[in-house]
Amino acid sequence: MSPSAFRSRSNIRSRSYTTNDLKFTFIYIMMMVSCLSQNVHNLQSDSDLSDTKLSGAVDLANKIYKNTGANKNNKNITVNASNLDLETANLNFNLSTSIVSNCSFGTTYSDYVNISQQIIFIYNYLEENKTTAVRVTVKSSNATEAFPTMFVARQQEGILSWQIPFEIGSSYSFWSVSRTLCPIDKSKKKTISKSQLIYITVSSMWEHNVHFTLTTNRVTDFELEHDKPRTFHLSVWQPTYFMYTFPENVSTILLKVTSASHICMTVSVQNIKCPVFDLETNVEFEGKHQTMTTQAAMFLEKDDFKEMNGFYVVFIVKPSNEVCEGYLQQTVIGPSNETDSKKTVTVEIKGTISGSQYLSAILGAIGFYLIFYVIAFIIGIVFAGCGLHKGLDELTQEEIGNERRSISSQPNESYGSICASTESSGDNILSPATSMNQIECSNSSDSLDESSIDFLHDASIEKEIVRTKTALFVSDLARKKRKKLAKSYRLYHWNLITIAIFYGLPVVQLVITYQRVLTSTGNQDLCYYNFACSHPLENYLSSFNNVFSNIGYIMLGLLFIVIVYRRDVLHKKILRKHGKLEKLYGIPQHFGLFYAMGLALFMEGIMSACYHVCPNYTNFQFDTSFMYIIACLNMLKIYQSRHPDINAKAHTAYFSMAVIIFIAVLGVVYGTNIFWILYALIHMLVTLVLTAQVYYMGRWNIDCNIFRRIWRLVITEGRKCTNPVYPSRFTLLLIGNIINWVFALYGAIKQPSDFATYLLAIFIGNLLLYCIFYIIMKLLYKEHLNWLVKIVICTSVITWAGSLYFFFQNLTSWSETPAGSRSGNRECILLDFYDHHDVWHFLSAISLFFSFMILLLLDDDLSHVRRDKIPVF
């Protein structure tokens, strides 16, 4: 079909050009000449375009321009592009430009273009006081990637171009596109013309006719209103954006986007300026943005948009759910099924809390924890003044005199009660050489310290006698010199201080860097906040409430250290006053582990706050590391209470904790099938080793003959398993082994995605089991719990139940994608400032504090009971 025949089909075309239009034609011809100079080999077969031919084309363009200039007074000049004598330039090319003027908004235009036929659509409208936008929707069903259909929209202040097929990446192509032209902001309406023109040029480089349709609409509801939800539809080929202007009395707002569809999309907030970055390929270059499936939210401040007092909200549907769901769903949406990707979205903008509410929430949290200081002070006065805590000071003078006479009348014995027990025992346990040395009890128990015990040549054999007795008492395992043990236990908190400094400082530096990157890039997928309740602190913290809610760990950790220090001071007074008498009564008091527990609680607050500066997949171990340490220290403290001489050294304990943290990191980063199998095997093996260590009180060795000894033990004493020598220890260890083996097998089979939480659950489960066992054994041995301990236990149980309820609300999850995590976001529930996870912080801090207090107060009823009457279990 010839160009003239093609034009004759249309009765809406005008061939009347204005002077300005002919100037544009001149520019367009020059552009075509430039293109022809590069692609002329497709049009002619003899040789390249010569200088003579190029100059001829340029002369032709100048001639057209001069002819139009000679008739400037004429408002309309008729020029037929197809009749231009292009042969003058020796070019085998005819270009026909058709104009469709006075186009109507809302009307669909359908036509064809090819290499020699282009069409210009002209829209004319009057700008009003209200900001409006123009949306252009085009479709070209038979366009190809080799010969796309090109669209160019020109306005007074900018130009926008795109093509069909509309390609996103290398896998997705679309034959329908809807684009919003950058609107003229109402602040500029005084400096621009009221009458606005839009030129939309449609062209193609294909020799065959390419069909297209074009529809242009004015978006009259382009501005979003405050506190009024807006529901609309969009799709992959239809990116959309709206404008919002801050009201005069609003300084901060919450932008909330919701959808029932799980189709992946991006929400972006950008400054009001052209061009608007509304494509999948460029949306990340401007403003703040986050991915979403069912919901998204952004906290925005007016001060961040001072220039225009508002912003654009851009919505872009992604072609696949790979980013949001974590799997790849490749789908090429063609002209027949573009509606398959439609997504219905509701956007709402509402105000946030004021600065006074910020202050009330902060002071309220601090005041709440100060109440614990007041209660602790009152209880301290009651215990000290009313004599509720009976210790050595409460013994009568007659009792003190009897005990001192008993001490002075005792014969010199080696290892305290060992000689007496061996003399009364008729069992010939020791070898003759050992018995001779053993009978020579030349030193009193007071003269024996850590070095004298550990370095005697028969010390190992004597430990075998003591620690393998069927009925053990605390006096049997509290024989090392107190000063040396105290120095050893003090290493726990001093080493922990060093660990905290060297571990904490790089963490602080890293999270500050995270915050700066988040602020500078605007990529809010970096951090897993609860965006529906995320209150920033200027540009320093994006979620200040999640950071500040850790104040409970810090304040209660310090309070626990103060309480321990007070008990330490009182105990030292008793030592100075009663001397050797203290060594006969109560559980041995060593406060090093208690100080370490308080410090660990304090550091948990610091590290959890650091994690919540930018919570994500790479730094979750910041939050859990000191949780592991707290669990380990609590179990060590329970064991130390009645096994003071055989507890783990500080460096050994912390090295074991470091190995645990290392395993946690491996599980998070490399959670493969091989890892889970190896972890399960290691877990079960370590459980067996610790079982033997606890059951035999450390009196066994791992060497090349270990398996031979185990086999002999099974052969000779296998039947005795139904009647174990140490029934209480056997029961605890049996239950512990069952629970730990279940944990290990569950991990290997189910392979939970959150390995760090899984590992933490193992430690909490073991700690809970040990605490329950210890309390039950106290009651079985007729030991009493005073009223304060009962209150603390009940309070701890209640707060732990509440804590776990809020913990499992799953507001966020770093094990999922950012969009998947964001789907669980919920609004604030406390003072319009704190969310469920903040309440977890509050309650878990209280729970840990009361758990520590249980261990501190649990054996106070034994302070006036002789150690040789306190059983070991």
Regions found by a protein language model. Give the residues of each.
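Non-catalytic, beta-strand-enriched accessory regions in extracellular/secretory proteins
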Residues: 46, 51-69, 74-305, 310-312, ...
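Residues marking helix boundaries in flexible regions
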Residues: 13, 28-30, 78
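Ala/Thr-enriched low-complexity intrinsically disordered regions
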Residues: 5, 18-19, 25, 52, ...
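Cleavable N-terminal signal peptides of Sec/SRP-targeted secreted and luminal proteins
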Residues: 21-37
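Long, hydrophobic alpha-helical transmembrane bundles and adjoining juxtamembrane helices/loops
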Residues: 96, 105-109, 118, 123, ...
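N-terminal secretory signal peptides that target proteins for export/translocation
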Residues: 1-17
